[in-house]
A protein has these predicted regions:
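A short, flexible low-complexity segment enriched in Lys/Arg and Gly/Pro that occurs
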Residues: 30-68
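Glycine/serine-rich anion-binding loops at beta->alpha junctions
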Residues: 54-90
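Exposed boundary/loop context
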Residues: 4, 8, 18, 40, ...
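Extended polybasic, low-complexity segments that bind anionic RNA or targeting/receptor surfaces
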Residues: 1-46, 91-207
Length: 207
């Protein structure tokens, strides 16, 4: 049974909650986590690199000098790869690096990293995360009050734009939503700050 304290946004202890064991209490599978992180990084890769082959570089139609009699090595074009301004051998072209992984693997990886965070006591539960207006200073004060002023991932149940705007200018802070939680973001954060509504959504979606 995984129990943890619940705090309000001022850092005051308001109760206790049981973390769902199906999500926060499994034995982490490092191999699957590695596969899913690799997949995530490949999927977000731009793949826009591009260079010209010798067939695509402008110019080079004229033979630079005659074939024989100069004492120099024979050359057919000034756009051959060994020349300055020549084409690139096996020039990279724009392509997609993305590939798919099955949902079971992604779900297991997420539960693994959430369980690791819980085992390290790096999951902080808040009764409700809300902001009446976008205020970065107030949000920073809240994070400090709950002991999360380092690299922090804040997870809410709904897309509250006031919370998003309040957190986006704080170095090391990222705000995301429970239904789109991913392995890379959780791994990249030192602390996980979750409100009770988000905790319920995580259990419903990923358990």
């Amino acid at each position: 049974m995984l129990k943890t304290n619940v705090y309000d946004m001022s850092g005051k202890l308001v109760g206790e909650i049981e973390l769902p064991e199906a999500v926060f209490g499994i034995t982490p599978n490092e191999s699957v986590v590695h596969d899913v992180v690799k997949n995530h990084l490949a999927n977000v890769r731009q793949g826009t690199q591009s260079a010209l082959t010798r067939a695509e570089v402008s110019g080079g139609g004229r033979k630079p000098w005659r074939q024989k009699g100069t004492g120099r090595a024979r050359q057919g074009s000034t756009r051959a790869p060994q020349w300055t301004h020549g084409g690139i051998v096996f020039a990279p072209k724009p392509r997609s690096y993305s590939y798919s992984l099955n949902k079971k693997a992604k779900r297991l990886a997420l539960k693994s990293v959430l369980s690791a965070k819980a085992a390290e006591s790096n999951v902080v539960v808040i009764d409700s995360i809300h902001m009446d207006a976008p205020k970065t200073a107030d949000f920073a004060k809240f994070l400090k009050a709950v002991g999360c002023d380092t690299k922090t991932l804040v997870v809410t149940a709904a897309a509250d734009q006031n919370v998003v705007k309040s957190g986006r200018n704080i170095p090391g802070c990222q705000v995301t939503f429970a239904n789109v939680l991913n392995v890379y973001d959780v791994l990249n954060a030192g602390k996980l700050v979750v409100d009770q509504a988000a905790l319920k959504t995580i259990e419903e979606v990923f358990a």
